[in-house]
């Protein structure tokens, strides 16, 4: 089962007061030591008065607005430790430590691939995770649902969104699946100076721990809970069998 849960993207966001997105250019990032000088853009930068987006050929994207800067990276290798997003976010923090940082978000995105079983995707959310009720059969078409969960952890808050999705992999036909988007939100508004910078670095460096927890929470709790609920409803047993056989 767990092999069907695939990490698709990782983003790290630094939230601060009064960012100036106009300063985020390839030349600035390279001159500040935030990215290597030999990194090449994959497309022309998108820049407006209030936002900027840079996409590099190695798969890393940098987007900034007046409140945050985000480093995003699609998963292109099985060696997760080779990812650049956290390294670049740390170097950015070291280059600009005086910004009034308020929060850090570590945001993994996962897809639970279910082949071509579109109906099973819907059932896992509507019948598996939600208590059966008359509203399930309301309307002319099978209803859909998006679930938003908030977890208060010891070190941060985890926001988790569960939704239906269609996943395109290369030139293959798009397949249905469950989409899981998470935000591990670390707050540092009460800290200052070197203490704040140290805490932010620690939060960034623990991103692999967050991703592992995220995947475990999905596999062990959410998906298995949905399967168990489907098993308890006779009309859904065949759908559960489909899920387990994929």
Predicted regions and their residues:
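Aromatic/basic-lined ligand-recognition segments
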Residues: 113-183
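Beta-strand elements of well-folded, non-transmembrane domains
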Residues: 16-18, 110-112, 184-188
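Aromatic- and glycine-enriched beta-alpha-beta binding-site module
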Residues: 76-115
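Intrinsically disordered, low-complexity regulatory segments enriched in Ser/Thr/Pro
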Residues: 60-79, 165-205, 209
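N-terminal low-complexity, intrinsically disordered segments
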Residues: 1-75
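Short, conserved charged micro-motifs
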Residues: 20-26, 80-82, 119, 192-201
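Conserved short hydrophobic interaction patches
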Residues: 31-35, 88-99, 207-210, 214-217, ...
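Long, compositionally biased interface segments
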Residues: 180-246
